[in-house]
A protein has these predicted regions:
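General marker for long, soluble alpha-helical cores
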Residues: 301-382
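Sec/Tat signal peptide C-region and signal peptidase I cleavage site
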Residues: 20-26
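Bacterial N-terminal signal peptides that target proteins for export
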Residues: 1-9
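Expand to "…catalyze enediolate/carbanion chemistry for C-C bond making/breaking, isomerization
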Residues: 28-308
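Bacterial N-terminal signal peptides
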Residues: 9-19
Length: 382
């Protein structure tokens, strides 16, 4: 080995043993230390435009009312959207409606009611499908924990509140491109996120869930809270559960939501109204009632005809409660029947009471609530 080679080896060995001269180290990127930029912030002195009518109702203190759509026909959706609701609750938890069908609804009739949806569960795919296609109200069912609630927040909101993606070519651009202030800049101030408390675990976690930034309302799911508790309306145990959910929302400064038939309970300020099917039946029943009263009093359409005022109400009860597919519609029909019976003759009132008793006997799972609703309306069902 010559002298030059030996010198090189000694130099290399020295570098290994005592370390080579240090270069300036580059710190590893740490996302937690990153400060979010100003690109989407409002200028000093500016406030975000509220273009979502549902959010405007909540900011004004409510009530915010959403009509429910289960059908897949855009004409039916458009009729509901024009009926005066603040938003439309498209049902996708318990229906086989596709996102393509829902997108057609919203593109055809983006208003006057804000487009909304109850998704099937709290995950990125479900919620971003909804928001990317134009939903401005997101209802998420069966939230049992703070972690599940945070998932719903994450996929509903853009950063820095959530983790919603801002990919290009989203369907909502056809609906919301022209909103004042810009969609991306004002979305976090306009979207309404409602989380449904449906189980005992959800009730236990309700107070912590309600405190999460981004949650606008807790929905006390009247049917499933009875399903999971084994109690019904009027039972002390059931009412305590409902009160716990409403109190959790109130203490956190957000809204407590419920079926519209609870509109007389002051703790609730946002509501789910009946389905399009129930509204069609009610509209038809009202029209037929008017015809029956006219023909019965004037003899039109048949001399000497007499009309029973119970007919349309009985038909609605039968349609909604003989084979229950949506509890809220049946309960609403019972409530309407009890109210209608107050102005009927004794014989017609007896017909209504008898039919409700038959339906109570035929639906043991809903019997307690049906009986409670009827009794609260002054209808004797035994």
């Amino acid at each position: 080995m010559n002298t030059k080679t030996l010198a090189i080896l000694i130099t290399l060995l020295t570098c290994v043993l005592i370390g080579a001269p240090a270069h300036d180290a580059v710190a590893q990127f740490n996302a937690a230390d990153f400060e979010y930029g100003d690109r989407f912030k409002m200028a000093d002195g500016e406030t975000p435009e509220i273009w979502n009518p549902a959010m405007r109702k909540l900011l004004d203190g409510g009530p915010m009312i959403g009509g429910t759509v289960r059908a897949t026909d855009p004409r039916t959706y458009c009729a509901m959207a024009a009926a005066g609701y603040d938003f439309i609750w498209v049902e996708m938890q318990h229906e086989a409606t596709t996102w393509e069908q829902v997108s057609r609804f919203w593109k055809t009739c983006p208003g006057p009611a804000a487009p909304g949806v109850r998704v099937a569960y709290a995950d990125e795919r479900e919620i971003q499908h909804a928001t990317d296609m134009g939903a401005a109200v997101i209802v998420v069912p069966t939230i049992d924990s703070v972690e599940e609630a945070q998932e719903a927040v994450n996929w509903t909101y853009f950063p820095p509140i959530g983790r919603r993606s801002a990919g290009g070519g989203q369907g909502m651009s056809e609906i919301w491109n022209e909103v004042p202030g810009g969609y991306r800049q004002t979305w976090n101030d306009n979207v309404v996120l409602i989380l449904m408390i449906e189980t005992l675990e959800g009730v236990e976690a309700a107070r912590e869930i309600a405190k999460l930034p981004g949650v606008d309302g807790l929905f006390a799911a009247s049917g499933d809270l009875g399903n999971f508790s084994g109690f019904g309306e009027g039972d002390a145990e059931y009412e305590a559960i409902i009160t716990e959910v409403a109190t959790a929302a109130k203490d956190a400064g957000i809204h407590a939501c419920a079926p519209l038939r609870w509109a007389d309970r002051p703790e609730f300020t946002c509501f789910q109204a009946a389905t399009e099917g129930a509204n069609i039946r009610r509209g038809a029943a009202a029209e037929l009632q008017q015809a029956a009263e006219r023909f019965g009093s004037s003899g039109g359409g048949g001399a000497g005809r007499t009309a029973s005022s119970a007919g349309p109400t009985l038909a609605n009860l039968t349609a909604e409660c003989s084979s229950i597919t949506y509890e809220a519609d049946c309960f609403s029909a019972v409530e309407s029947a009890a109210e209608a019976a107050t102005s009927m003759s004794d014989s017609d009132k007896a017909l209504i009471g008898r039919r409700v008793r038959e339906l109570i006997a035929a639906n043991p799972s809903q019997a307690s609530q049906m009986r409670s609703i009827a009794s609260a309306g002054g209808l004797d069902v035994g």
